[in-house]
Amino acid sequence: MDKQAIATWYDESSPLYRYFWYLNSDSFALHYGLWDIKTKHIGDALQNTNKVMAEQANITSNDRVLDAGCGIGGSSLWLAKYKKADVVGISISAKQIEKAKTLAKQAKVDHLVSFSVIDYLHTGFPNDSFDVVWAIESVCHADKKEDFLKEAYRVLKKGGRIIIADGFIRREPETEREKQLVTAFYKGMLLPNLYTFDQFEDAMKKTGFKHVTVFDKTHEVLPSVKRFYLICRFMYPLIVIAAVLHIVPYIFTAGCKAGSVQYEAVQAGVGGYGIMYGEKE
């Protein structure tokens, strides 16, 4: 995992997320979002992810939550505001943490949340520190997902829960085109790999988690997948020109390419999205 490259990507792309993704919503979210029959717009979908995960993990005001890979604090703020949980958000991006602290003050929940620049693979927190470890689309950046799971298990209290929402591979790519799609997506999103649902479930169980449950949410992110695709198809020519003129980092072209191919990968049955839950007994 190239931590500096990942931090730079999120730092540089922050304005794009603000203008094209979470828009005027107060989700401050950098993830896909879950859609149901009542969902009207992307802001609702982004908040739905928090609701679904919090319900599955049964988060209450008695819980201390580690938001691993917190971005600019969207989920942390939501958990503090709506669940009154004590939340610690961590990210490897100093700019994200600075923004998260500002948003916490504006939302008047800074007494419940704290943010720090910390690598989720090496947190430095004492054993048995948290009731819940929460991660949305951050574990995907780890070279070995097992390394994240081991650290999460270590910092969880006995009886603690882990809840993860992320991208997965529903099946290994078979055709040359499918392999090209996956390679382009990995490159653009700075991903070393993605696990299948079965591989990740097995990794959780080997780490020691019990009551591991897999929720395939691929269908529920489809509107966001298509939205990401349309934005990137529209923006790609402009991004290429801007990169050539050194107006934006060249890495943006690969990011746009990733957005363009992920829709086809999902439609082909290769790309997927899911929520993983487990408990430390």
Where are these regions (language model features)?
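A short acidic, Gly/Pro-enriched loop at the edge of an enzyme's catalytic core
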Residues: 121-132
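Short alpha-helix
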Residues: 192-208
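A short glycine-rich, Lys/Arg-flanked "PGG" loop and its adjoining helix->strand segment in the class I
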Residues: 146-161
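Class I SAM-dependent methyltransferase SAM/SAH-binding core
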Residues: 64-122
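Conserved alpha-helix/loop element of class I SAM-dependent methyltransferases that forms part
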Residues: 23, 27-36, 40-61
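Conserved Class I S-adenosyl-L-methionine
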Residues: 213-281
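Short, glycine-/aromatic-enriched active-site segment of Class I SAM-dependent methyltransferases
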Residues: 168-192, 204
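N-terminal auxiliary segments of SAM/dcSAM-dependent transferases
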Residues: 1-21
